[in-house]
């Protein structure tokens, strides 16, 4: 994933910063506890597509 794109992207819900988890192929918003998938190097920034994180952040 392009580093410049990561600098621009924010959470669509809270507008906070995202953490890139390469191994899981997702972008994580810690305040919202959501993980947005990355498919074919394209981040899917839709709330309906996001995965809810567990209490331990996984």
Curated annotation (Swiss-Prot):
One of its GO terms (cellular component) is cytosol. It comes from the Bacteria. InterPro entries: Trm112-like (IPR005651). Signal peptide: none annotated. Pfam families: Trm112p. Belongs to the UPF0434 family. This is UPF0434 protein Daro_3207. It comes from Dechloromonas aromatica (strain RCB).
